[in-house]
Swiss-Prot record:
Magnesium. Can also use other divalent metal cations as manganese, cobalt or zinc. InterPro entries: Cof (IPR000150), HAD-like_sf (IPR036412), HAD-SF_hydro_IIB (IPR006379), HAD_sf (IPR023214). The keyword Ribosomal protein does not apply. Phosphate binds at residues 10, 44-45, 192, 218. The gene is ybiV. GO terms for molecular function: fructose-1-phosphatase activity; magnesium ion binding; phosphatase activity; sorbitol-6-phosphatase activity; sugar-phosphatase activity. The lineage of its organism: Bacteria, Pseudomonadati, Pseudomonadota, Gammaproteobacteria, Enterobacterales. It comes from Escherichia coli (strain K12). NCBIfam families: Cof-subfamily, HAD-SF-IIB. It is an enzyme of class 3 (hydrolase). Keywords: Hydrolase, Magnesium, Metal-binding. Homodimer. This is Sugar phosphatase YbiV.
């Protein structure tokens, strides 16, 4: 077995539906991973400041691929961030503002931004995923490096909106689903696998050394990349098709069960 890196998504994967995880179990596992020199990476569409809130004791020890790959941190230090040009940002914002029913968050290096006129329920939902969230009068006046946009919609509207944005923003941003009604607009090529690849290069490791665990469309590239790819029991069907292996759902500690299999050297890690 040559596992040197374990990468996990958060929502619908590492976290249960109550947005918590079995901390005593994981902390014991983490100490064992550390002893064996196995690195732990969180890869999520969420904001870095939100992600570190789940790992206050470990935030300067582990690595984070945040914002779906647009922001990479190792041991508390920023290694990489994506960047839209000011012109590209204006095009994207202009397109999103065409639909008056569409609420969205603009994600930047310093903060995430939401319209001061956005519905309270939308702001409250987004605040759970973006711990730094500032209200703005005009998205076009944001003075920050922008690298992602996030929308939340009823599930039945998602395919139509994705198709529309795919055409309108072709070459500038790519829409991906991240579960729970979320659509993220990412810079083409700046997905989770790209962020993980940056860390692997730094560590002189390869995808052959990686275990990746996920449940949604934004996990597809990292699952295709990793030698040991696991779909959660609650994963979207297309993700189950992509992953080589399956684990339990997020309410039955599916991600922690994979980590335990690595530590116990049981199937598929014993072949």
């Amino acid at each position: 077995m040559s596992v040197k890196v374990i990468v996990t998504d958060m929502d619908g994967t590492f976290l249960n539906d109550a947005k918590t995880y079995n901390q005593p179990r994981f902390m014991a596992q983490y100490q064992e991973l550390k002893k064996r020199g196995i690195k732990f990476v969180v890869a999520s569409g969420n904001q870095y400041y939100q992600l570190i809130s789940f790992f206050p004791e470990l935030k300067d020890e582990i690595s984070f691929v945040a914002e779906n790959g647009a922001l990479v941190y190792e041991h508390g230090k920023q290694l990489f961030h994506g960047e839209l040009t000011r012109h590209e940002s204006r095009i994207v914002i202009g397109e999103l503002l065409k639909d008056k029913q569409l609420n969205f968050v603009a994600c930047g290096l310093q903060s995430a931004y939401v319209s001061e006129n956005a519905p309270e329920a939308f702001v409250a939902l987004m605040a759970k995923h973006y711990h730094r969230l500032k209200p703005v009068k005009d998205y076009q006046e944001i003075d920050d490096v922008l690298f992602k946009f996030s929308l939340n919609l009823p599930d039945e509207q998602i395919p139509l909106v994705i198709d529309k944005l795919h055409v309108a923003l072709d070459g500038i941003m790519k829409p991906v689903t991240s579960g729970f009604g979320f659509i993220d607009l990412i810079i083409p090529g700046l997905h989770k696998a790209n962020g993980i690849s940056r860390l692997l290069k730094r560590w002189d490791l390869s995808p052959q050394n990686v275990v990746a665990i996920g449940d949604s469309g934004n996990d597809a590239e990292m699952l295709k990349m990793a030698r040991y790819s696991f779909a959660m029991g609650n994963a979207a069907e297309n993700i189950k098709q992509i992953a080589r292996y399956a684990t339990d759902d997020n309410n039955h500690e599916g991600a922690l069960n994979v980590i335990q299999a690595v530590l116990d050297n049981t199937s598929p890690f014993n072949s």
